[in-house]
């Protein structure tokens, strides 16, 4: 039997038993959808194949996609918002790197030194994930494809997007107005 230790979105540590290794990613997805995380972000961020970026299942690491009011796609992980950045290929005498997509944010004073990366000047940032090179891994993709998964991706052309149920706001029942000479009841 395997065990995974998660940190809930409220900071509690929870150990979950996994019957078989074939269920490991399913368990991570389940608790990741709740915002629970396991482990720490590695220095430089998680490394994934670039072919997985379009339909990556962010719940595997306890993250979720979110679209800002300005329309910018972000990834939320442990209360921090990470921006999508496209990095050009590097081809120099000393370094050759293929193009990549990185999700990162500006570093904060509370971030441990080992996760901070230097940029131009005095700017530091923290990377959540980088998608570069490699061969596609189906196990990292959203199960059942990206369409209609709530991860912010459109349905493929020629296929209708699944309708997303709309949440209805709960409204308190209207209270009758207080009549003159009548005292209002204390709510507790």
Swiss-Prot record:
Changing residue 132 to A: Reduced ssDNA-binding. Keywords: DNA damage, DNA repair, DNA-binding, Stress response. Induction: Induced to high levels following extreme ionizing radiation exposure. Also highly induced in response to desiccation stress. Changing residue 64 to A: Reduced ssDNA-binding. Residues 140-188 are annotated as: Disordered. The keyword DNA-binding applies. Residues 152-173 have a biased composition (Low complexity). GO terms for biological process: cellular response to desiccation; cellular response to gamma radiation; DNA repair; double-strand break repair via single-strand annealing. Disruption phenotype: Cells lacking this gene show a normal growth rate, do not exhibit a decrease in the efficiency of natural transformation, but display a reduced capacity to survive ionizing radiation when exposed at doses superior to 2.5 kGy. DNA repair following irradiations is slower. Cannot be complemented by ssb. A double recA-ddrB disruption shows no signs of DNA repair 24 hours after irradiation. Pfam families: DdrB. Changing residue 85 to A: Reduced ssDNA-binding. GO terms for molecular function: single-stranded DNA binding. The keyword Signal does not apply. Changing residue 102 to A: Reduced ssDNA-binding. Contains a novel ssDNA-binding fold, which is structurally and topologically distinct from the OB-fold universally found in standard SSB proteins. The disordered C-terminus of DdrB may mediate interactions with other proteins important for DNA damage recovery. Homopentamer arranged in a ring-structure; DNA binds between subunits and along the top of the ring. The pentamers self-associate to coat ssDNA in higher-ordered structures; oligomerization facilitates the assembly of extended nucleoprotein complexes. Self-assembly does not however require ssDNA-binding. Interacts with SSB. ssDNA-binding protein that contributes to the ionizing radiation resistance of D.radiodurans. Plays a role in DNA repair and genome reconstitution in a RecA-independent process. Required for recovery from severe genomic fragmentation as a result of exposure to severe levels of ionizing radiation. Binds ssDNA but not dsDNA. Stimulates annealing of complementary ssDNA. Does not complement an ssb disruption. This is Single-stranded DNA-binding protein DdrB. The gene is ddrB.
């Amino acid at each position: 039997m395997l065990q995974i230790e998660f940190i809930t979105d409220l900071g509690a540590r929870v150990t979950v038993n996994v019957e078989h290794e074939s269920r490991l990613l399913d368990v991570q997805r389940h608790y990741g959808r709740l915002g629970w995380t396991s482990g720490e972000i590695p220095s430089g961020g998680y490394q994934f194949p670039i072919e997985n970026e379009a339909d990556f299942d962010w719940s595997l690491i306890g993250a979720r996609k979110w679209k800002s009011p300005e329309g910018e796609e972000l990834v939320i992980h442990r209360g921090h918002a990470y921006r999508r950045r496209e990095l050009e290929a590097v081809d120099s005498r000393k370094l050759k790197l293929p193009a990549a997509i990185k999700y990162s944010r500006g570093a904060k004073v509370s971030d441990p030194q080992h996760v901070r990366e230097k940029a131009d000047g005095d700017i530091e940032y923290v990377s959540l994930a980088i998608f570069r090179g490699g061969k596609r891994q189906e196990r990292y993709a959203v199960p059942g494809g990206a369409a209609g998964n709530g991860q912010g991706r459109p349905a493929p052309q020629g296929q209708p997007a699944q309708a997303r149920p709309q949440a209805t706001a709960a409204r308190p029942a209207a209270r009758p107005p207080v009549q003159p000479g009548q005292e209002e009841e204390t709510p507790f």
